Regions:
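Helicase motor core with emphasis on the C-terminal RecA-like subdomain
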Residues: 1-152
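Cys/His-rich short segments
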Residues: 152-169
Length: 169
């Protein structure tokens, strides 16, 4: 977990230093950010594809198939990507935005290293992520009980990000 300054540049440095040419998943909170991130990575010479629920189904399926079958593809995705994905050689899972819960983070990062080889979980985290998610919770049309549950989950995620002890496994 790194302090977010310029998340895309930080991601690029991480990929070039540790995962050049390897398969991975970059999770983003919005569809727009998925598209922008995939385009950015492609412009930097990294084979990246977007995946989100707003894409035409044939394009989404083609991108998923390419990711599953080919080596070295990076998938920029929302949480819509993941169910049924069992690519054993995913070397990293990165988050450009704070996940909504520890449970979600655990599930998403668990998609890396299924072949038993070393893999990394990486996240760029900043206080603005918390502010944005709190606003999304506050402005949602959910009932107050559900909003409280979401707030507790966000607080737990914040606790993980702010802990000073080692998170390396």
């Amino acid at each position: 977990i790194v302090e977010k300054a310029n998340a895309r540049a930080q991601l690029l440095a991480f990929l070039r230093a540790e995962h050049e040419g390897e398969a991975g998943i970059v999770y983003c909170l919005s569809r727009r950010k998925v598209e922008e991130t995939a385009a950015f990575l492609c412009a930097e010479g990294i084979r990246a594809l977007p995946y989100h629920a707003g894409m035409d189904s044939p394009v989404r399926e083609r991108n998923q198939t390419t990711f599953q079958r080919e080596d070295g593809v990076v998938m920029a995705a929302t949480i819509a990507f993941g169910m049924g994905i069992d690519k054993p050689d995913v070397r990293f899972v990165a988050h450009l935005d704070l996940p909504k819960s520890i449970e979600g983070y655990y599930q998403e990062t668990g998609r890396a290293g299924r072949d038993g080889m070393a893999a990394n979980a990486w996240m760029a985290y900043g206080l603005q992520d918390v502010v944005l998610q709190r606003r999304m919770i506050d402005e949602s049309e959910a009932d107050e009980t559900f909003k409280r549950v979401l707030g507790v989950k966000l607080d737990a995620m914040l606790g993980l990000c702010e802990t000073l002890s080692c998170r390396r496994m």
